[in-house]
Amino acid sequence: MLDAGTLAVIPFPYSDLSATKRRPVLLLTAPDAYGDFIGMAVTSQPGHTDNMAILQAMMESGALPKASFIRTDKVVSLNQSLIVKEVGKVTESLRLQAVRRLCSRLTGVSPG
């Protein structure tokens, strides 16, 4: 069952929608009645602004094959039918940190 905090692999769309590439995504919300959820991109590239590291200690279950970072600046609404596989679940604390970082970005108010 998909829950908020699940890490899943999907064909992630490029910003210009020209193509997709299979990448991990963090579900910020559980899928709704229509199967839609809000997620954040996950990358192995450390150089992006607003990245949050995912350490193994921050995983409730599963593991990512490489050191990975949540892209809090890449938020998407997707459908669960796109999920190729589940790879694990992050702690509720990490998921809430990502949500707070997003809220801070949207409101301009530092997370407290």
Q: What annotation goes with each model-predicted range?
A:
Residues 16-21, 27-60:
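Compact nucleic-acid interaction/catalytic patches
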Residues 60-112:
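C-terminal terminal-subdomain/extension
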